[in-house]
C-alpha cells in the first residue's frame, strides 16, 4: 500500500470489518509496528479514536479532558489558558458540556469531546476512526462540515475511516477501499464502481447510485 495525503486533501477509508482500517491509522500514529516498509509523518497530528465509552465514575469534566490535551501540546510547561479550552469546545458545538462529567455524557456527546481533543494541537493531519458513530444525522453533517472547513481554510489533511461513503461523499477527494483480497486507491468515481469492487472481493458487487447516494450491494 502506497498512500500519501496531500495538504488539504480528504481521504475516505472504506471496507468491511477486519480488513485493517483502524490498523492503518495505528500504523500512521506509530502505535502499531510495521513488518515492512515505512511511514513518514512530518506534521502535527490530531486523532479522533473509535467510539469507546468513558467510565461512568470518571471524575473529570469535559473541560478537564480538553485541557489535558492542550497540556501535552504548546502549553505543556504551563497551565493551558481557560479561554483556549472554551474555544475548542465551542468549535465542536460542545460549549454546554464543558462543566459536565464526561462519564455522564451520552456516546455522541463524548464523541464531541474527542473531536475537541483532536484539535488541541492545531493539527496539520487529522486521523478520524469512524467519528460519526453515536452521532445523530444533524451532528454527523455538522462534523463533516467542520472537518471540510478545516481542510479548506487551514490546509489540514483528513484521513477518515468510515463504513459508508454517503455522509462524506460531497467532500471526499479520494477513496482508499480495503478488502480481504487487496485494496484500491483513487478518486471516488474511479473506486466506487461495480467492476472495481467486484475484482477486489472476487465476487459480484453492485454499486448503485440512488438519488445521489451510493449503495454497495
Predicted feature locations:
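Conserved ABC ATPase "signature" region
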Residues: 80-97
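Catalytic Walker B motif of ABC-type/P-loop ATPase nucleotide-binding domains
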Residues: 126-130
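H-loop/switch region of ABC-family ATPase nucleotide-binding domains
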Residues: 162-163
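ABC ATPase nucleotide-binding domains
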Residues: 194, 200-217
Amino acid at each position: 500500500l502506497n498512500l500519501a495525503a496531500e495538504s488539504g486533501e480528504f481521504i475516505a477509508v472504506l471496507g468491511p470489518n477486519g480488513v485493517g482500517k483502524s490498523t492503518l491509522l495505528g500504523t500512521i500514529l506509530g502505535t502499531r509496528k510495521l513488518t515492512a516498509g515505512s511511514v513518514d509523518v512530518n506534521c502535527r497530528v490530531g486523532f479522533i479514536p473509535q467510539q469507546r465509552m468513558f467510565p461512568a465514575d470518571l471524575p473529570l469534566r469535559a473541560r478537564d479532558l480538553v485541557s489535558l490535551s492542550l497540556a501535552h501540546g504548546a502549553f505543556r510547561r504551563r497551565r493551558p489558558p481557560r479561554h483556549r479550552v472554551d474555544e475548542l469546545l465551542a468549535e465542536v458545538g460542545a460549549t454546554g458540556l464543558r462543566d459536565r462529567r464526561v462519564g455522564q455524557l451520552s456516546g455522541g456527546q463524548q464523541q464531541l469531546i474527542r473531536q475537541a481533543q483532536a484539535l488541541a494541537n492545531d493539527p496539520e493531519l487529522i486521523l478520524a476512526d469512524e467519528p460519526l458513530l453515536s452521532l445523530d444525522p444533524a451532528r454527523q453533517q455538522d462534523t463533516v462540515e467542520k472537518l471540510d472547513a478545516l481542510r479548506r481554510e487551514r490546509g489540514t489533511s483528513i484521513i477518515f475511516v468510515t463504513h459508508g461513503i454517503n455522509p462524506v461523499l460531497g467532500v471526499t477527494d479520494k477513496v482508499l477501499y480495503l478488502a480481504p483480497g487487496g485494496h484500491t486507491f483513487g478518486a471516488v468515481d474511479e473506486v466506487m464502481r461495480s467492476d472495481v469492487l467486484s475484482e477486489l472481493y472476487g465476487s459480484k458487487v453492485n454499486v448503485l447510485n440512488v438519488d445521489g447516494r451510493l449503495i454497495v450491494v
